[in-house]
Amino acid sequence: MIGWGDVYKVVAATVPLYFALFLGYGSVRWWRIFTREQCDAVNRLVAFFALPFFTFEFTLHTDPFQVNYRAVAADVISKAVIVAVIGAWARFMSKGGCAVSWSITSFSLSTLTNSLVVGVPMARAMYGEWAQQLVVQLSVFQAIVWLTLLLFVLEVRKAAIGMYVDGAEAAAAAGKDVEAAGAAAAAGTVVVAAAAGKPSLWALVKVVAHKLARNPNTYASFVGITWACLANRLHIALPSAFEGSVLIMSKSGTGMAMFSMGLFMAQQEKIIACGTSFAALGLVLKFALGPAAMAIGSIAVGLRGDVLRVAIIQAALPQSITSFIFAKEYGLHADVLSTAVIFGMLVSLPLLVGFYIVLELIR
């Protein structure tokens, strides 16, 4: 049962995040320390250094041989349900590019959770040590599979947009060359015209593969889980110097991510940068669609009792901070994701307690 001491632990875990957010916001809005270009550089620092080390560090210390595979299967089914719902919605969208962009954002909003900061203390308070371990396992699986998948989709979108723009510019240049060739022919001059073609799928694959190969987020979780398997099987430990080097960088991950979010907020005209309609949509996707899909997946694989309850509650955890960093880095609805993170954490505590009470009543 949740007591006031447990509530305090959750609040104590989230207050430092808002402190970092406040510092980032004030450094731009009031103190004018950073320019827009410097804010982008801070976000890139977080995306390519702090977050990979953070992911690597917490993945290192998991035990892959104690994973609840039914819960993982339920998570996979829930994501498939969400993809099906979003795909059905996207078919009715009139603009293809807009549908793809909002499909990616909707997937982030409804599936990616802030498990380690809020989920771990809440699960421990509600159901004990085993529930905490289950939340950590699903968080590791999220880092390995869903965040990597999100990164891949964002890179594909970025590469496709870049090729489309380059192709359009090449076509325009070719058109000008044709006109110039006509004028030159009239004057008796020879001109070589440039040909513009549509970029091939293979060209897109090469660009995306090159970008992913250079992104440390691609390797962090895979290297971490590989070492975790070896360490738990062979009973070996990392050298203290190496672990200390990883730890000193990983500790900056969450704080710097919130600081970067504060920088972004300060550059917007309003606190709720995306507007109340999109903010409400984000909350519905996070706290309604996500838990509902997880309930379907959990029941489908036969989860029962407290394991089922923990699976549903962890799906209702607030928005992943990493999802904002990626959205900002790739220029995709960062205003929506920042609002979801900030206000999602504010409303998550009463909502999670509400989920807990309702699920206990329907035993």
Swiss-Prot record:
This is Probable auxin efflux carrier component 5a. It is a multi-pass membrane protein. It is found in: Membrane. NCBIfam families: 2a69 (TIGR00946). Belongs to the auxin efflux carrier (TC 2.A.69.1) family. Keywords: Auxin signaling pathway, Membrane, Transmembrane, Transmembrane helix, Transport. May act as a component of the auxin efflux carrier. PANTHER family: AUXIN EFFLUX CARRIER COMPONENT 1B-RELATED, AUXIN EFFLUX CARRIER COMPONENT 5. It comes from the Eukaryota. The gene is PIN5A. GO terms for biological process: auxin export across the plasma membrane; auxin polar transport; auxin-activated signaling pathway. InterPro entries: Auxin_eff_plant, Auxin_Efflux_Carrier, Mem_transp_PIN-like. It comes from Oryza sativa subsp. japonica (Rice).
